[in-house]
Amino acid sequence: MLSVILFTEKLNHSSKNKDMAAKIRCGIITIHNIPNYGATFQALGLFRYLVIQGYEVEFIDYSMNKPMASNTCEHSTLKKLLSLPKKLLNYQYYLNSKTKATAFAKFWNKHYKLSKHHYSGDNEFFDATLNYTVAISGSDQLFNLSLTNQSEGYFLPNVKNYKISYSTSFGMSGLSGDNEEKLIRLLRSYDRLSIREDTVAEYLKSKYGI
């Protein structure tokens, strides 16, 4: 939360009243629409913190790139087919999953404020103009390119104003050799970085001065 606090303190110092604060528009990009308790509550926590400061806040309604075809497709398909009879027989599992997804959707509709436009993948997102005073990536594993199907949208490359990351994670992949050059290029565009993994943060600071 440190990078967010530092930024909001800077804004509060320059804002004379709540009316001025309300004119400050904050856009949050995160994995906001999966039925997962951790992802949902950490997204809502950041959202509520900024709203309490008096800012106009919304989630950028962005979906990561669709999975790319790979050589493991045949193996994955076979694995899914072998597990299909078990899932079909487990009707209670299906009902529980459906009930959970419905409950999450109701919660999101009640507590989230989304951008008016939905962006599906990088190609559509990069063409958009985002008019936020500040844009925030975080938290969750947005910097884990293996998890996000190489989605660069979570790095907000089309944001020209102030941009920070809040407690963003690289996941188990860390800074892998294949993605390191790409990640460094994307990370350098941030005004402030808050990273969850201490070892990665120290590595970025010592090797790249980030």
Language-model regions: role of each:
Residues 26-37, 41-185:
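Aromatic- and Gly/Pro-rich donor/ligand-binding loops
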Residues 44, 197-198:
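Alpha-helix N-cap/helix-start capping motif
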Residues 142, 199-201:
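Alpha-helix capping/helix-boundary segments
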Residues 190-197:
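A short beta-strand/loop micro-motif in the catalytic core of glycosyltransferases
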Residues 201-210:
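Helix-loop-beta element that forms the nucleotide-linked donor phosphate-binding surface
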